[in-house]
Amino acid sequence: PHHTMAQKIKNIKLYKNDLPLNVTFKGSIAIDTETMGLNINNDRLCLVQISDKEGNSHIVQFIKDCYDAPNLRKILEDKNILKIFHYARFDIAVIKKNLGIMCESIYCTKIASKLARTFTDRHGLKDLCKDLLKIDINKQNQTSDWGHDSLTESQLEYAANDVIYLHEIKNKLDKIIKREGKEYLAQACFKFLPTRAEFDLLGWQEKDIFQHK
């Protein structure tokens, strides 16, 4: 099956292997991925979740070795659409490894939080939802078999939760970043992310090329 809508619960739509042509986005989207594990070179991409500003979630489920997704790739490469991630470094590396393209126009809420909220070391998505939005999200499906052919309703809701709050989090963080005069630093970090992801794919995750040693 190819990009047929398999399920729809609440504002969540699930497709197989690609987005359909009639799903389009403008301005900005929130994106996350789910993989078999956390090794970007060995653990395959299972899901790509996309949410628009209205909180509608579109989830693309990849059957193993079926990564020909021209509609999704076109959106990810579109420089006119801002992609909001939480920990973009991992997601864009996984997308490059599996879909063969590098995302353009990137924003990372984890980096933004580290720049804006220097008074805390709590920069996880659950922390940002709780601290900035007063929302307690459920992370019980964080370790889950995302490669299974049929996903549970709770898995789909978990996957959607990873993207539906990112627009609002970005808006909150941007206000602090602007107030503290760190906009140029944030933009420089976001622009460097594709390069950082390329280093990770080369096996340099733990190596800092800027260090003296």
Show which residues each predicted segment covers.
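Acidic, Mg2+-coordinating catalytic module of metal-dependent nucleases/exonucleases
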Residues: D136-E198
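Acidic, Ser/Thr-rich low-complexity intrinsically disordered segments
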Residues: E198-K213
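Generic structural signal for hydrophobic core residues of well-folded globular domains
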Residues: S51, K79, L115-A116, L132, ...
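A polyampholytic, Gly/Pro-enriched intrinsically disordered region
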Residues: H123-I137
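Glycine-rich, flexible loop/turn motifs
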Residues: M102-C103, I111, L133, Q142, ...
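Conserved RNase H-like, two-metal-ion catalytic cores of nucleic-acid enzymes
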Residues: M5-D127
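A broadly conserved amphipathic alpha-helix scaffold signal in soluble, globular proteins
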Residues: A93, K126-K130, I164-N171
